């Protein structure tokens, strides 16, 4: 099968198109013939940085060639002996073995059956692949950790990005009041997703406009930004961070406001995927795929992600 492999960290030129053997599945896995792959910022971090590669993939000491990627949608071609929920021919999607080694940049992927869900019939493989790591991050942050409920006021940063555009839609599906932040170019897009308000960070400080958010979802790197998110939360509210941990001054400021704080890392979960699939079937969330690349051009997808200006998601068609 064809795969995109990585032998050493570095630029996009380190991603090589290779021919390798199909993966063999165990009794609890299914073999997926991949139709679409989604690309995320974490993919580029793992490609660039040895520490990210070691920390997320957790490779064996003798492993020296890697297949990165986690987000797939495709068709079940083989099932393990213990698998009863899926059969050959089923269309499925999911985030595979994250954190860990998903090996998604390939024509075939071995996936634990408890990490995937049936693809909704009303969406394409490209839309499904997009709604995996990014949608799971939004779901787990808002639902699993923040326990979002109707009428919560939710402030979502980078609301037009991969995680953010799902977070807006998930929050609205719960009946929350949503305020998105981002650049002026993404304002109309985020409001069309259902956000009730939009703050253009290039023109005004969000913490000067909002100081009573019940939930703040912060996916922006840097302690300074997280301090401002803490200021935007109401006393007793919840702040979710994807990048910095709550330490030192951050912890002190959060404690003073009696905030619930969580630094989250998304993890593969088939039950959560089923909840996302349900919302997609109901038309409550949609994937915005801004660009598609052919498999051979996957390195160019990394290049686009690294601009930091992607609207919604980038997908590779296999």
Name what the model sees in each region.
Residues 91, 153, 177, 237-238:
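Short glycine-centered segments of the SAM/dcSAM-binding site in methyltransferase folds
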Residues 129-200:
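Mid-domain Rossmann-like dinucleotide-binding core that forms the NAD(H)/NADP(H) cofactor-binding site
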Residues 270-318:
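C-terminal hydrophobic helical "lid"/dimerization subdomain
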Residues 81-85, 178-189, 223-226, 246:
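Short glycine/proline-centered loop/turn elements that form peptide/ligand docking sites
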Residues 101, 220-285, 317-318:
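Glycine-rich phosphate-binding loop and adjacent beta-alpha segment
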Residues 23-38, 51-98:
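Glycine-rich beta-strand-centered segment in the early N-terminal region that forms part
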Residues 61, 65, 70, 85, ...:
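NAD(P)H dinucleotide-binding glycine-rich loop of Rossmann-like/cofactor-binding domains
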Residues 208-215:
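A short acidic, Gly/Pro-enriched loop at the edge of an enzyme's catalytic core
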